[in-house]
Swiss-Prot record:
GO terms for biological process: gastrulation. Belongs to the TGF-beta family. The lineage of its organism: Eukaryota, Metazoa, Chordata, Craniata, Vertebrata. It comes from Xenopus tropicalis. The propeptide region and the N- and C-terminal thirds of the mature protein are necessary for neural induction activity. Although cleavage doesn't appear essential for activity, residues surrounding the cleavage site are necessary for activity. The propeptide region is both necessary and sufficient for bmp-inhibitory activity. Keywords: Cleavage on pair of basic residues, Developmental protein, Disulfide bond, Gastrulation, Glycoprotein, Growth factor, Secreted, Signal. This is Nodal homolog 3-A. The gene is nodal3-A.
Length: 401
């Protein structure tokens, strides 16, 4: 099924109707309720003891509420071309005179994805009168190794009281991740390559009075400071020559849904398709036409509720917590062949405790139209908003086999 390219104009599941008793007792969680929940002055909110940026939840709420006006002129078209939004809270930062040094762990950024936009969002308290600063961006997995990505100059003023400062770092990340080069342009200043301790020593020797170095061990930054500095990356997965396994299953169980296993599924499907064509040719030559069209049983869409808490995903999925994926139902005796194409929907269905009758689908009564759903969740230590295709059955119908 073709991938829906318009990320912003997604169709989301409507409020669950006829909610089963097992789910009625649970309190529904909405993006708005999380936004109104307890938070600290650092702009982060808690979920199961883990913190996520306010911006990510606000972005998710704007999308599902279709509030296009709340998106910036840069983010609006970018969302339509993206299927993944990753956020990286700064691991630490230091300010030495007019030099700011920001550290992020960008290990999970994949070069196989097409980078659409990278934004640096700084939401810090007022610094009084405006002054120019040089901002340097580093990638670091730990405090021992630091990789310089690029730098730029900007003016920091009291405007930070009312809003966040947003910088477009797309070219910085693109040049280094794709080309392996640091960006050197007029609006970006090349760093001198000095170690942080050298900068501190230089500032001390000059008797700078405005040096503010936050340390933990050597480079500590309080939660307040770091969590108000985030890097947001918009990307889209590149199309593959071969069909991919379900995106959810591939992320959770890469060995189970490896390329070799996927190739076997594709080959099996091709054999099945070839056998069906041969069977059709035989039937055409040997079976006389029927005078009256055969009456088929009714193929209908029925509820199939998915509760992520019950299948063990509740600790890392922020929203939605539950939804109606639906399934197709009709009287039949033969289940679907295992060589049918795997989808996110079929993967979710395999995890539900359905009876044999509920799990079985007629080969002719199948989903003929699926819709996508966006999910907000943790992926390792990163907070991700990702669009998954083929998650909900929209229409059921008969298919000839």
């Amino acid at each position: 099924m073709a991938f829906l390219s318009l990320f912003l104009c997604l169709v989301f599941s409507s409020p669950l109707m006829a909610m089963p008793p097992a789910l009625q007792g649970r309190k529904a969680i909405s993006p708005a309720s999380i936004l109104k929940g307890p938070s600290t002055d650092n702009g982060a909110r808690d979920f199961h003891g883990r913190k996520f940026p306010h911006f990510m939840m606000q972005l998710y709420q704007n999308i599902i509420s279709r509030r296009d006006k709340d998106l910036s002129n840069l983010e609006h078209p970018t969302l339509q071309e993206s299927d993944t939004v990753q956020s990286f809270i700064a691991k630490s930062y230091t300010t030495v005179g007019n030099h700011w040094t920001l550290f992020f762990d960008m290990s999970s950024i994949s070069t196989s994805n097409e980078l659409k936009l990278a934004e640096l969002r700084i939401c810090l308290p007022s610094f009084g009168k405006s002054h120019s600063v040089t901002v340097e961006i580093y990638h670091t997995k730990d405090t021992k190794e630091k990789l310089f990505m690029g730098s730029f100059k900007t003016k920091i003023s009291s405007a930070l009281d009312a809003d966040c400062k947003v910088f477009n770092l797309t070219m910085v990340l693109h040049n280094y991740l794709i080309r392996g080069k640091r960006l050197i342009k007029d609006e970006y200043i090349q760093a001198k390559g000095l170690l942080l301790r050298d900068l501190e020593k230089s500032a001390a020797e000059k008797g700078a009075e405005n040096v503010d170095t936050l340390k933990q061990d050597k480079y500590h930054v309080s939660d307040f400071a770091a969590e108000r500095i985030i890097l947001v990356v918009f990307a889209k997965e590149r199309s593959q020559a071969k069909p991919d396994p379900p995106s959810l299953g591939k992320q959770l169980f890469p060995l189970k849904y490896g390329m070799a296993d996927n190739a076997n599924k594709v080959n099996g499907f091709r054999r099945l398709r070839r056998n069906k064509k041969e069977k059709t040719r035989i039937d055409v030559g040997t079976t006389p036409p029927k005078p009256v069209e055969e009456i088929k049983p009714k193929c209908r869409k029925v509820d199939m509720f998915v509760d992520f808490q019950k299948i063990g995903w509740g600790s890392w999925i922020v929203y939605p917590k539950a939804y109606n994926a639906y399934r197709c139902e009709s009287a039949c005796a033969v289940p679907l062949n295992e060589t049918d194409d795997a989808t996110n929907y079929s993967y979710i269905k395999s995890l539900l405790p359905l009876s044999d009758t509920e799990r079985r689908e007629c080969p002719s009564c199948v989903p003929v139209k699926m819709r996508s759903m966006s999910m907000l969740y943790y992926e390792n230590e990163d907070f991700v908003l990702r669009h998954h295709e083929e998650m909900i059955v929209e229409e059921c119908g008969f298919k000839d086999i």
